[in-house]
């Protein structure tokens, strides 16, 4: 604990380095697809963030002005989103008031409680800035603008080799900004070393060899989180389940009918019965409270991730046709869902094979010849 307190104190009291250019490479499935460059000069940071995968990706230019404590007092963001929408975002904090403008419109609030702004279209560099602020906070949790609470949990410290020597980077779990945490690593000086997910990473230039290890660890942390959620929230019914007092849609009559009792066992609906039909031995009975029971939806074009698996279930999507993915990542995800380790929809793997070009997706399998393409077809067929 003392080590992290000293690190936080150092990061809070020391201004950013003078005239330092921090460069990162953007990697998708281990392939270099772009860059992030941060030109740090005293309390001013100029950022160039650009990557392209499958012909799409953000083009972002940021200018951040920081106060003496490292909190943003002005933030201007211009460019385009991955699908080409214009980005024109700004933030300013002055005289105890914060004002901002993003794609949802304009807003303002008192900046006495929350001082850190979370941008709508910022680069990953800003996550390192927020992580440093959270490390300097006593409980590593703080209110942020435009709203919400960000929190930070310390994970493992790992050493990575590169041209500037070994770096002992500590991984952190940053929560509160999205439905799933972000996983990022800071070096001993508190500077961003990497941001990682199971399929994507932003890594300090020269240390790209850390990509796979970082992504594997991000997948491990993500899996552990969803395993905990599964243990807390999942219900394991040993016998048939009867939901009473529910309405169902009759596709022949095009109307809602009922109330009925719907009985299922394992993964099949056994019967739709009168609401007062007798219960058989060993059933679990659930009161549907007059709701409407609808079939699970089928997502016909998905690129599912572990973070999205549970969200699909929560949204009523119980089956997904995955149109392209990292095969190793997807295979592990399917196995964890099928054995009940985590929650997720049934996944039909639709093998993705693409020729190499400037517009290639780095997801699935890239080939250059007819023979390579046929070999990949055989590879997928053997795993159907």
Task: List the model feature ranges, each with a label.
Residues 140, 286-294, 300, 308-384:
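Divalent-metal coordination cores built from histidine and acidic residues
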Residues 36-71, 145:
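N-terminal, post-signal-peptide region of Sec/Tat-exported proteins
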Residues 57-124, 178-189, 193-205:
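Contiguous hydrophobic, core-forming segments of folded domains
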Residues 205-248, 278:
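Extracellular/periplasmic ectodomains of large secreted or surface enzymes and adhesion receptors
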Residues 31-33, 84-169, 196, 212-222:
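Solvent-exposed helix/loop surface patches that form functional interfaces
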Residues 253-294:
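Histidine-rich, glycine-flanked metal-binding segment
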Residues 19-25, 41-48, 68-76, 96-99, ...:
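Short, hydrophobic/aromatic-rich segments at coil-to-beta transitions
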């Amino acid at each position: 604990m003392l080590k992290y307190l000293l690190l936080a104190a150092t990061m809070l009291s020391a201004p950013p380095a003078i005239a330092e250019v921090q460069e990162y490479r953007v990697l998708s499935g281990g392939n270099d697809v772009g860059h992030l460059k941060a030109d740090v000069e005293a309390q001013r940071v100029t950022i160039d963030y650009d990557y392209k995968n499958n012909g799409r990706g953000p083009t972002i230019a940021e200018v951040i002005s920081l106060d003496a404590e490292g909190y943003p007092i002005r933030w201007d963001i211009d460019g385009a989103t991955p699908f080409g929408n214009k980005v024109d975002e700004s933030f300013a904090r002055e005289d105890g008031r914060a004002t901002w403008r993003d794609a949802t419109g304009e807003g303002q609030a008192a900046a006495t409680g929350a001082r850190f702004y979370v941008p709508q279209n910022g680069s990953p560099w800003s996550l390192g800035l927020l992580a440093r602020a959270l490390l300097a906070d006593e409980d590593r949790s703080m209110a942020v603008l435009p709203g919400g609470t960000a929190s930070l949990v310390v994970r493992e410290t790992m050493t990575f080799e590169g041209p500037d020597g070994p770096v002992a980077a500590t991984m952190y779990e940053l929560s509160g900004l999205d439905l799933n945490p972000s996983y990022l690593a800071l070096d001993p000086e508190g500077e961003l070393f990497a941001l990682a997910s199971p399929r994507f990473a932003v890594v300090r230039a020269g240390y790209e060899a850390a990509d796979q290890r970082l992504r594997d660890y991000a997948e491990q942390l993500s899996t552990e989180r969803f395993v905990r959620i599964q243990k807390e929230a999942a219900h394991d019914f040993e016998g048939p389940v009867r939901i009473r007092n529910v309405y169902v849609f009759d596709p022949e009559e095009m109307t809602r009918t009922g109330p009925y009792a719907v009985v299922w066992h394992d993964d099949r609906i056994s019967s739709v019965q009168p609401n007062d039909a007798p219960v058989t031995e060993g059933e679990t009975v659930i009161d549907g409270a007059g709701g409407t029971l609808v079939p699970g939806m089928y997502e016909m074009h998905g690129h599912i991730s572990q973070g999205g698996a549970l969200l699909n279930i929560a949204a009523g999507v119980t089956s997904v046709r995955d149109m392209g993915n990292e095969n190793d990542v997807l295979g592990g995800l399917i196995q964890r869902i099928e054995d009940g380790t985590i929650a997720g929809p049934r996944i039909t793997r639709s093998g993705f094979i693409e020729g190499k070009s400037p517009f290639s997706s780095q997801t699935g399998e890239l080939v250059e010849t007819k023979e390579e393409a046929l070999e990949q077809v055989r590879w997928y067929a053997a795993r159907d």
